[in-house]
Amino acid sequence: MTANVCLDESVRPRLLDDFIGQDELRANMRVYLDAARERGQAMDHVLFYGNPGLGKTTLAQIMAGELGVNLVSTSGPVLERSGDLAAILTNLGRHDLLFVDEIHRMPIAVEEVLYPAMEDFKLDLVIGQGPGARTVKIDVEPFTLVGATTRIGLLSSPLRDRFGIISRLEYYTPADLARIVARTARIIGANLTEEGAIEIGRRARGTPRIANRLLRRVRDFATVHAGGVISADLASEALGRMEVDESGLDQMDRKLLEVLIEHYGGGPVGIKTLAVACAEEVRTIEDIYEPYLIQCGFLKRTPRGRVATAKAYRHLNLLG
């Protein structure tokens, strides 16, 4: 396990009350958790969706902790065969949580095993082959499936409709991100001023994972150049040297906009063409870069392709 992974785990909140941001989702989740505990039943199946780094995995861990049950984690691409999932389901304890990250990448054959398990807590297994094959129903303990996806549109309707709770995670406000990095700084022993937290928070692309990563790198600059103190000026200088601008755009964000404007007149241009021009994968652009650029008003997605906005021209000091 790497040092960064250990650090990430150490700063994850363990309780729902310690989770910062996503106020409406958090308030609703408190009701769902308390109701499940009160009734002594497995919580209804939950689907979290939203961009990477917003806290889907953390929320699954919090749910298990709050309910006092085990959390079994896997991911869609790992579940290659229906038997893989069946083995996991039959080993779950009563009311345990099964967390499936990237659930949209689960094969259809595996997905179909989930249907009776989610609805009736039963597995339909085929024993044998050919004319002698027969279907056997096996009971599994009542459990809660927690799915996480960055691309809810790729989930099949039958699977999506079996989730009783579907919650979207939004980008975080700069104020919430400042609180998150301040909390992380206390845990890891970083000397972060209130102004330094605000500076990091407003450049973190609305994403806690990025905010904590920037804090670690800014702390390096503070250790070498500022006696360990992370002030607003130090944070601004460090982030500038890392090519993270005041809007949170990094080198790749700006390259994407510059290619769109300078090579294609601001668009519209197809995503595949744009990906080739930027030497980047289509999925990476769609999942990592586009959502934030659209959220900030630098990019528009149209039926004819991607278009740079007037705000993008102004941000890059280019004439539109």
UniProtKB/Swiss-Prot annotation:
**Subunit architecture:** Homohexamer. Forms an RuvA(8)-RuvB(12)-Holliday junction (HJ) complex. HJ DNA is sandwiched between 2 RuvA tetramers; dsDNA enters through RuvA and exits via RuvB. An RuvB hexamer assembles on each DNA strand where it exits the tetramer. Each RuvB hexamer is contacted by two RuvA subunits (via domain III) on 2 adjacent RuvB subunits; this complex drives branch migration. In the full resolvosome a probable DNA-RuvA(4)-RuvB(12)-RuvC(2) complex forms which resolves the HJ.
SUPFAM superfamilies assigned to the protein according to its UniProt record, in alphabetical order: P-loop containing nucleoside triphosphate hydrolases (SSF52540), Winged helix' DNA-binding domain (SSF46785)
Q: Report what the protein is called.
A: Holliday junction branch migration complex subunit RuvB
- Top EC class, one word: hydrolase
| Record-stated family | Belongs to the RuvB family.
Catalysis: reaction(s): ATP + H2O = ADP + phosphate + H(+)
Annotated binding of DNA, by residue: 301, 306
Give the main location: cytoplasm
Positions that bind Mg(2+): 57
Q: Residues annotated as region Head domain (RuvB-H)?
A: 246-320
Where along the chain is ATP bound?
Answer: 12, 53, 56-58, 119-121, 162, 172, 209
Q: What does this protein do?
A: The RuvA-RuvB-RuvC complex processes Holliday junction (HJ) DNA during genetic recombination and DNA repair, while the RuvA-RuvB complex plays an important role in the rescue of blocked DNA replication forks via replication fork reversal (RFR). RuvA specifically binds to HJ cruciform DNA, conferring on it an open structure. The RuvB hexamer acts as an ATP-dependent pump, pulling dsDNA into and through the RuvAB complex. RuvB forms 2 homohexamers on either side of HJ DNA bound by 1 or 2 RuvA tetramers; 4 subunits per hexamer contact DNA at a time.
Key words of the record: ATP-binding, Cytoplasm, DNA damage, DNA recombination, DNA repair, DNA-binding, Hydrolase, Nucleotide-binding
Start and end residues of each stretch annotated as Small ATPAse domain (RuvB-S): 173-243
Q: Name one GO cellular component term.
A: cytoplasm
Q: What is known of its domains?
A: Has 3 domains, the large (RuvB-L) and small ATPase (RuvB-S) domains and the C-terminal head (RuvB-H) domain. The head domain binds DNA, while the ATPase domains jointly bind ATP, ADP or are empty depending on the state of the subunit in the translocation cycle. During a single DNA translocation step the structure of each domain remains the same, but their relative positions change.
Alphabetically, which GO biological process terms does the record hold? DNA recombination; DNA repair
Instruction: Provide the species name.
Output: Nitratidesulfovibrio vulgaris (strain ATCC 29579 / DSM 644 / CCUG 34227 / NCIMB 8303 / VKM B-1760 / Hildenborough)
**Region span, Large ATPase domain (RuvB-L):** 1-172
EC code(s) of this entry: 3.6.4.-
Pfam families linked to this entry: AAA_lid_4 (PF17864), RuvB_C (PF05491), RuvB_N (PF05496)
Gene Ontology molecular-function annotations: ATP binding; ATP hydrolysis activity; four-way junction DNA binding; four-way junction helicase activity
From the Swiss-Prot or TrEMBL record, state where the protein is found.
Cytoplasm
Q: Which PANTHER family match?
A: HOLLIDAY JUNCTION BRANCH MIGRATION COMPLEX SUBUNIT RUVB, PTHR42848
